[in-house]
């Protein structure tokens, strides 16, 4: 099969690289940053933690499909999935809050 280059090591790029590798391609992933994960990062300041990218799996079926099609064990054997309700809560300076 073809030799394939994937630019970036975010979630989508890594999923594409995994699928290409399983299909028989020789895949090389290039990432300009110090770590893989793309926007999935965490910033801490003054005792507070801030997720700078996606922190929830809103569509776990997509990840299950990726694990199955790349020959991995089932998703639930690799990570613990916990339903979160509400998924997010935003509190504004005036005290109002929105839960989603």
Predicted regions located by residue number:
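N-terminal glycine-rich phosphate/pyrophosphate-binding loop and immediately adjacent elements
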Residues: 2-100
């Amino acid at each position: 099969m073809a030799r394939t280059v994937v630019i970036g090591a975010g979630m989508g790029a890594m999923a594409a690289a995994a699928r290409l590798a399983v299909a028989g391609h020789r895949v090389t992933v290039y990432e300009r940053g110090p770590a893989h994960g793309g926007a999935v990062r965490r910033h801490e300041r003054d005792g507070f933690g801030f997720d700078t990218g996606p922190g929830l799996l809103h569509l776990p079926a997509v990840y299950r499909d990726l694990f199955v099609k790349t020959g991995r064990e089932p998703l639930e054997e690799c990570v613990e999935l916990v339903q979160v309700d509400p998924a997010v809560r935003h509190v504004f300076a005036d005290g109002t809050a929105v839960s989603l």
